[in-house]
């Protein structure tokens, strides 16, 4: 399958998914990708790739000659990422990396763009490792808890980086008989830092 559009936001249902493997939803993914300011032929590290939705869309946007390092410790997540990359014709640009962040980041080539999908308790260490691996670039992290937001902002402050925080609330309409009911997704904080 090819995605014929130049804009991000591949519908969630077009990605292969599995129970327990997280996916950055289309609306949040679109904003995160725009915050990354991806370039043709660029290099992105997707930490906690899950289903690979960000990896796939980034590879499509950056085009031929680009590299996306899709990092996850979960073998099932990496297999989903592989299948989704194949489905959308970008398997040649997506490199699967099994390992735990932040340690595994030291094994990767330098990149000027990092996307962190979650990170949990390791989020501050992941941010610090990413900054150490780039001369100049952008880090975008999506988090859902206030604790993760606080940890990320504190880590960025300690590093002296400029950053911005955007909170996104998404509700999708669902038909219920004659009516359309708006169903909310979890609010997400998108943290963008400039190194």
UniProtKB/Swiss-Prot annotation:
Enzyme class: transferase
Molecular function GO terms recorded: cobalt-precorrin-6B C5-methyltransferase activity; protein methyltransferase activity
Keywords per UniProt: Cobalamin biosynthesis, Methyltransferase, S-adenosyl-L-methionine, Transferase
Associated pathway: Cofactor biosynthesis; adenosylcobalamin biosynthesis; cob(II)yrinate a,c-diamide from sirohydrochlorin (anaerobic route): step 8/10
UniProt binding sites for S-adenosyl-L-methionine: 24, 48-52, 72, 101
Alphabetized SUPFAM superfamilies for the sequence: S-adenosyl-L-methionine-dependent methyltransferases
PANTHER family, per database record: COBALT-PRECORRIN-6B C(15)-METHYLTRANSFERASE (DECARBOXYLATING), COBALT-PRECORRIN-7 C(5)-METHYLTRANSFERASE
The protein's name: Probable cobalt-precorrin-6B C(15)-methyltransferase (decarboxylating)
Species annotation: Pyrobaculum calidifontis (strain DSM 21063 / JCM 11548 / VA1)
Lineage start: Archaea, Thermoproteota, Thermoprotei, Thermoproteales, Thermoproteaceae
């Amino acid at each position: 399958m090819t995605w014929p559009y130049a804009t991000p936001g591949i519908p969630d249902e077009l990605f292969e998914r599995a129970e327990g493997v997280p996916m950055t939803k289309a609306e949040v993914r679109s904003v995160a990708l725009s915050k990354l300011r991806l370039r043709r032929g660029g290099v992105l590290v997707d930490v906690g790739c899950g289903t690979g939705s960000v990896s796939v869309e980034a590879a499509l946007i950056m085009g031929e000659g680009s590299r996306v390092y899709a990092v996850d410790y979960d073998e099932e997540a990496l297999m989903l990422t592989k299948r989704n990359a194949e489905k959308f014709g970008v398997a040649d640009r997506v490199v699967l990396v099994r390992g735990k962040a932040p340690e595994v980041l030291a094994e990767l080539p330098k990149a000027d763009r990092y996307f962190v999908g979650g990170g949990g308790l390791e989020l501050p260490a992941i941010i610090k490792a990413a900054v150490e691996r780039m001369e100049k670039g952008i880090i975008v992290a999506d988090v859902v808890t206030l604790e993760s937001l606080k940890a990320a902002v504190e880590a960025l402050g300690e590093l002296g980086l400029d950053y911005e925080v955007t909170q996104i609330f998404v509700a999708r309409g669902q038909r219920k008989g004659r009516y359309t009911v708006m169903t909310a997704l979890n609010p997400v904080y998108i943290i963008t830092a400039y190194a």
